[in-house]
Every structure is written in structure tokens, then in C-alpha cells.
Amino acid sequence: MSGVQKPITLLVYLSTYQLVNLLTTPSTNTFAFMHYTLKKSLGQHFLKDENVCRKIISALGKQKFERLLEIGPGGGALTKFLLNIDGIDFKAIELDEEKVNYLSRAYPELNGKLIHEDFLEACAPFEQEFIIIGNFPYNISSQILFKILEWKEKVPAVIGMFQKEVAQRIISKPNSKS
């Protein structure tokens, strides 16, 4: 093996104003999935606008992949789109038992694909290369990225939404204040 490491592509859909607006303002394009509680301790925030989900899914369409892992599917906003992608091996990992129960009921096609586990403690769910997607929990976004770096040989791309401050740190130059 050569000493050259493959770079990980990180595609981030980021719009703090839009996210705040989506979380606080009713819309005709919102999901009706709030059959459970948001847990601040888990950094939970859920997408409610299908247009934002479509933009994240659109970024996924620019990648070639056979396996896909969704981190923290929550209420299934992205999951419902991901389940419609043909010809891939899809899995989702969710820590919150309440969300796992909801997802299992709402999306029976997740049977055998939903992992009830803490992502930060999980082993790679695939032996081969896979893409990671998600609307990442705010309070552990950095830890998620460090965990993904442990799998850097298997993960060529990460696509999703991060909190603005986390995204700014990701793209900042070394030794900068960000």
C-alpha cells in the first residue's frame, strides 16, 4: 500500500437562516412526522422541508456508490427519499429508541437496515466502500467527523447538513481561529 491517502469528499448543504426558519415556521412543504419528542441532550433537530431534503439528495446523486449509511435518521425526512434509490445497499443508524420505534413503524422497508446503536461506538456497517449521509446532530458533529476519519479508507464522501459553525471549522485553514 502506498503512503498516499485518498481524500474524503465533504458536501455540505448549509443555510443557517433557512434551517432556523424551517424549524420555527410552518410551511406547506413540511413533514407531518412529529409523533415523538425532540431530545436536546442528543442534539436533535429535524428537517421539515422536503425541498431541503431534495437538495441534499441531489448532492448525493453526483456520487457513484453502491452502499450508503444514513447517520441519525430521526423522523425519516431523508430516509424516505433514500429508500427509493434502486440498486444500493442502504443502512441507517439511530441511537434514540423512540425514533427507532417510529421509523420501524413508519418505514417497514427499513426492516433489517436500521441499526439501533450509538454511531460513535459503532463498527463500520459495510466491509466495502460506502457513502455517509445525514442531517447531523449539532452537539456531536465534530465527534461524528472524527469517527468517520477512522473509516477514511472506506468512506470517500460525506454528504449532509451541519451547523454553520461546524461547517466553518471544517473549511477553515489550519491554525486559523475558526
Each model region followed by its residue ranges:
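Intrinsic disorder
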Residues: 2, 10-17, 22-23
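Short intrinsically disordered, low-complexity coil segments enriched in acidic
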Residues: 1-4, 92
